[in-house]
Amino acid sequence: MDFSELSVECLLTKLVELGFDQTREERSCKYTDRDFVQLGCQRVLGSFQSGRDFLQHQHEVEQTKIARSTFFKALQSSRRLQVCEDVSRGILKVLNEQMDTLEVDYLKQFSALNEYEVYAGDGHFIEHACHTKLIDSKKEQRRTGKLPKLHAAGLIYMQNLRNGLLSLFAPVSDGTRKNHEMPIFRNHYEKFKAQTNKRVIYVLDRAYVDKVWWSRKMGPNVDFISRSKSNFSLTMCGDMGFDDNKEINQGVKRDFLAGLGGNSAAFRFIDYKDPETGNTYQFYTSNMDLEPGLIAWLYFKRWTIEKTYDTSKNSLCEQKAWATGEGALQVQAHFICVVYNILRFINEITLKSMDEDEKISYRKKYADWIKKREEKAIKKGRSINLLLKNSLRMPKIAIQFIRFLKNNFHSPLPLRRLLPILRLRLINYVVF
């Protein structure tokens, strides 16, 4: 199906319809599940200050009257949560196939990664819902030794580093309690892993260090990449050979195996010195096959998910939980994933439609930035990592691009007719 022949609103409607093919939880209600998902995505696109603001807009502008209690009870419904999870996964499946059709693969130059799915993962925290209540103070004081307080609401997301599509991994906290991310990751790992048959590499920060658990999970189908902690006690097991003449291994100083403390499993450690800044890093991983420089590069590409969080928080204005409870927080997260993935898909369609001159203009700003960095490094007697110039870069979705799609959500024009303006929004920053 050619999605570019649909308007933005019809594209969302069609993808939601395809997503519902993946769920068995849909029921016939006055406030239908399809309306719930559709309106939830529209709220993400609308930059509303609150749920009441959104409902008033629906009533006065869209001529759709929804009772406040109906909307907020739907957000907290466990059945509707399952519907949203199934639909989000179904839409993700459709968009993965569409990305393959568009030949979107930001890791394609690294043939060693062809057999892997590579995910960047991290926690993302926003303000808790305004009606979030403190949990029982005496019980919590006995548990932690201090009086309870409200915290940020947070979730763990995973982003596919091949095509940029985002998916919810697990909730961390609705704000009533501060939780560490690694126990949450351990509890939901098997469920997420079951979604793919390929080998998986998780690129995670140091919040996900757990030498005992990872040593049990080390195997042919799953690997992780992270950074070492300063308190690691290493038991040397021997060096691994690598070719320091390869471009990919620029900056690698050492590649070796070591045990952690009393753990019998040996992990791979890579000492890396950034040729541009001189900063040193030590990465550790369970993968024994990839070039050490590629391990380091994948960790640096983890920053992609931080740019995605910036898009969610500042471009889509999703800075606060919609309702109390982890269930409502997950529903909101699924809506954010659906909207972000559709924006990413339209972004790739727009890039694909550019002619050569437009592609050169689009890449010029990044090329000029890299050139300035290179000149600055040369003055200091250093150099930049060649992969900065020679590898594919997953762009952050431009704010003017998102604003244009928001403003034209109800436009009857097909996406194909909007592409000329969308290309301009990517190439030039227009001052209004």
Where are these regions (language model features)?
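A short, flexible helix-boundary coil/loop motif
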Residues: M1-Q22, R27-K30, G241-Y272, N314, ...
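Short, conserved catalytic/metal-binding motifs centered on acidic residues
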Residues: L39, F54, I66-F72, Y116-I126, ...
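Active-site-proximal, Lys/Arg-enriched surface segment
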Residues: L75-L161
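Basic, amphipathic alpha-helical segments enriched in Lys/Arg and hydrophobic/aromatic residues
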Residues: A323-E348
